[in-house]
Amino acid sequence: MARNFELSLILFVLYLSTAAIVMARNLEEESSGDTEFIKASCETTSYPDRCFQSLSSYASEIKKQPRKLAETALAVSIARAKSAKTYVSEMTDYKGITKRQHEAVADCLEEMGDTVDRLSNSLKELKHLEEGDSGEDFWFCLSNVRTWTSAALTDETACMDGFGGKAMAGELKSLIRTHIVSVAEETSNALALINDFASKH
């Protein structure tokens, strides 16, 4: 009797172990597939390495969904834009800043504020789209998303326009440019993924 119980217990433990291994393997394969989806999608962007680096950690949430991928790309762009905006605002107190540089920083700060607003509007609009819908409302909303995201990219470019010319060259410009370029690349990638999502409808 005791031997039968021990045998049953051993078999039960083996069953649980096998089930756990199979489940872990399935999850690993699913995760790998999700990651490959992101990698393949990022190849359609202008900055695929940055795209994959920024989005691969969200693979389990994205799960091969083009819309979710575009939403996540926008969310990443917003976070990067907010960070850049904060950084630019701190540069108004940069040591030795000239009047012209101060004006350029102020203009850039305004442009980054617009960038955050436009990207936030894009994300909200994208989330309002109905799954499976491809009617006029869908394309109208998607047009808004594209327009706002493109405008955000223009704002980011305009931010650096104020630092044009040799007189504006130097460390301040270089420091700000590093942050703005990062945002612009994320935004460009987000726009490409939005277009990729649109092409599937």
Swiss-Prot record:
Residues 1-24 form the signal peptide. The keyword Chloroplast does not apply. PANTHER family: PECTINESTERASE INHIBITOR 7, PECTINESTERASE INHIBITOR-LIKE. GO terms for cellular component: apoplast; plant-type cell wall. Binds reversibly to PME3 to inhibit its activity; the stability of the PME3-PMEI7 complex and the inhibition of the pectin methylesterase (PME) activity is pH-dependent, based on protonation status of amino-acids at the complex interface. The record marks K85, E103, D114, R118, E125 as: Involved in pH-dependent PME3 binding. It is found in: Secreted, Extracellular space, Apoplast; Secreted, Cell wall. CDD domains: PMEI-like_3 (cd15798). Its main location: secreted. Disulfide bonds join C42-C51, C108-C159. This is Pectinesterase inhibitor 7.
